[in-house]
Amino acid sequence: MNLDQAEITALTKRFETPFYLYDGDFIEAHYRQLRSRTNPAIQFYLSLKANNNIHLAKLFRQWGLGVEVASAGELALARHAGFSAENIIFSGPGKKRSELEIAVQSGIYCIIAESVEELFYIEELAEKENKTARVAIRINPDKSFGSTAIKMGGVPRQFGMDESMLDAVMDAVRSLQFTKFIGIHVYTGTQNLNTDSIIESMKYTVDLGRNIYERYGIVCECINLGGGFGVPYFSHEKALDIGKITRTVSDYVQEARDTRFPQTTFIIESGRYLLAQAAVYVTEVLYRKASKGEVFVIVDGGMHHHAASTFRGRSMRSNYPMEYIPVREDSGRRELEKVTIAGPLCTPEDCLGKDVHVPALYPGDLVCVLNSGAYGLSFSPVHFLGHPTPIEILKRNGSYELIRRKGTADDIVATQLQTESNLLFVDK
């Protein structure tokens, strides 16, 4: 996404900061390029956790993607976005029975079971509903695949079932009467910028499907290759060779379809790669101050809206890329200075930029955080200190659409019961 400073400045005259601005044309072009490079036998599924705005999800539905959800709430959001049940998969290591019941009742394409106990819960619920539930099993592979920002497989994790347990898992699968086994899922990590490790993991997943056929005589109807495609947030990071990934994985999938899996659906999940670079988070400078020889610039947005870009939970890290828009009438040439850019919250973790070199910033100027389309608002502690949720704006085909209103105090208290009549019991 290219930042147009005049456009951003004009929007701040109509909409109160902070806000997110998404470039819908960029999102579409980015996805269609990925789609055009990839074997048609591979379907893409949007990971809703990366951004749960239903207006963005609707665009991906219109472009033919399925959706991956990880809670009953995300399942409801997916249905509100218009996704049909047969285009929804449900993952997550800790699904409650009530959530599994909703998934079974909804008839979604696939529940990704992450333990043998979960398989039996699904079977019990399917029998109760007199329905056939469709499941895939998530496998934690015996092998680890190179470096990735957050490892989710190939090491001890709460996700999935160890590959070494496959005999016991398949014994459980064979015992199911109301639950249909349709395939496997492997997801080894997120924010992965290692091209070769992604390729290796996806090829390994295809081979696991072959092994299941050879050992157990079961053909996988669905092989979920995972995803985890990363984007370079910081100057020291290099972009994936996405052409190499799509070309190599497409060829490997085609070979598998030609030899063993002619009817199998292959899936790649993506959220960050599809959305991260398509948005900017716009904040306004409220104050500038000095403390013990350092300059602090206080802006009106921060950790409560965009936790991933702040210092929350990290002692050492890099700053997200930012651009600065001088708005004051006297904003001529300004000298560079080293500052810390902090948000409005009562915690030192609410820091958008530490020791950044910027043109001198004053109240009314704008600080824009780039690469903010994924794991922004959906990943943030929005209730902390009671600030309103930010506006979200979608730009598409030269028009602007408000896709999330500014939050209110009523939103904060909406789920909090207000009367004494809510007393449930007295513990004596």
From Swiss-Prot:
InterPro entries: Ala_racemase/Decarboxylase_C, DAP_deCOOHase_LysA, De-COase2_C, De-COase2_CS, De-COase2_N, Orn/DAP/Arg_de-COase, PLP-binding_barrel. Keywords: Antibiotic biosynthesis, Decarboxylase, Lyase, Pyridoxal phosphate. Pyridoxal 5'-phosphate binds at residues 228, 269-272, 375. One of its GO terms (molecular function) is diaminopimelate decarboxylase activity. One of its GO terms (biological process) is antibiotic biosynthetic process. SUPFAM superfamilies: Alanine racemase C-terminal domain-like, PLP-binding barrel. Substrate binds at residues 272, 375. Its EC number is 4.1.1.95. It catalyses: gamma-L-glutamyl-[BtrI ACP] + H(+) = 4-aminobutanoyl-[BtrI ACP] + CO2. It comes from the Bacteria. The modification N6-(pyridoxal phosphate)lysine is found at residue 49. Its cofactor is pyridoxal 5'-phosphate. Pathway: Antibiotic biosynthesis; butirosin biosynthesis. It holds the Pfam family Orn_DAP_Arg_deC. Homodimer. Pyridoxal phosphate-dependent decarboxylase that catalyzes 1 step in the biosynthesis of the side chain of the aminoglycoside antibiotics in the biosynthetic pathway of butirosin. Able to decarboxylate L-ornithine, L-arginine, L-lysine, but not L-glutamate or any D-amino acids. Has low activity with substrates not bound to an acyl-carrier protein. Belongs to the Orn/Lys/Arg decarboxylase class-II family. This is L-glutamyl-[BtrI acyl-carrier protein] decarboxylase. The lineage of its organism: Bacteria, Bacillati, Bacillota, Bacilli, Bacillales. The gene is btrK.
